[in-house]
Amino acid sequence: MRSAQVYRWQIPMDAGVVLRDRRLKTRDGLYVRLCDGEREGWGEISPLPGFSQETLEEAQAALLDWVNGWLQGQSTLPEVPSVAFGVSCALAEAAGTLPEAADYRAAPLCTGDPDDLVLQLADMPGEKVAKIKVGLYEAVRDGMVVNLLLEAVPDLHLRLDANRAWTPLKAQQFAKYVNPDYRARIAFLEEPCKTRDDSRAFARETGIAIAWDESLREDDFVFAAEAGVSAVVIKPTLTGSLEKVREQVQAAHTLGLTAVISSSIESSLGLTQLARIAAWLTPQTIPGLDTLSLMQTQQVRRWPGSALPCVSDDALERLL
């Protein structure tokens, strides 16, 4: 006997969360809970404004349509990426095919005063991997901050994300302020320039490795081993079904590229599932999941060690 519930939710964000020049005041999304006999599974559907191709309203319509079909015995996954991801997670949980083991390590997202960051990063236990968003301020300032951190913490490796913010000139201004001796400790810089060709040229000219992120979701993207490209950053909410995520990880690994499972600012429920996916598909790589601190609450499932209050499903708006 099949049954299903669909919930809609909204989480207040901390002030100062800006995506593509838009302030994100709340994170809005949906949960689906699927029950099949004694088995149940949850999934999160939360399109990311400015990044997802679908709106929340479009995702909601696609989800409700799919759930009604599933209750009648249909099984084809929806095509809308965030819905395909959430539904496939719920189905995998119900079927017992999403492993419980999780990788709760998170490359911390560094913001704030650089001097404070040096102290925090120096005290980090284990493998020191951290992430910095660049391209929000002046490229020269970004270069100076990155150089300062790499100089002050000799065993630190940084992941940088520019979200295609720079012109070739600005990218070069950034690189000019990073000591060539430290550049090998930049694990990768995600999409420094507006075009792939400009990003490739940046990698060639500076020796700073780059990673593809937005490119993975473009129709003409092909996985290939290229000089200067070290990684791909896979955001499942933007990618689609678990099977598609798995195919992309496999394609990257076959070419010797690092695959990083990364957050699209999901709620704690979605983040804990991403931690499980990372432990399953990319066990050697610290995932990029340090986004819960941007929110004011957790929901349904807790992230281990987080002091944020957790809202139960009883408090969510039920649509079905």
Curated annotation (Swiss-Prot):
Binding site for Mg(2+): 161, 190, 213
GO biological process, one term: menaquinone biosynthetic process
Gene responsible for this protein: menC
Organism: Citrobacter koseri (strain ATCC BAA-895 / CDC 4225-83 / SGSC4696)
Annotated pathway: Quinol/quinone metabolism; 1,4-dihydroxy-2-naphthoate biosynthesis; 1,4-dihydroxy-2-naphthoate from chorismate: step 4/7; Quinol/quinone metabolism; menaquinone biosynthesis
InterPro entries membership: Enolase-like_C_sf (IPR036849), Enolase-like_N (IPR029017), Enolase_C-like (IPR029065), Mandelate_racemase_C (IPR013342), OSB_synthase_MenC1 (IPR010196), OSBS_N (IPR041338)
Molecular function per GO: magnesium ion binding; O-succinylbenzoate synthase activity
HAMAP family the record matches: MenC_1
Protein name stated in the entry: o-succinylbenzoate synthase
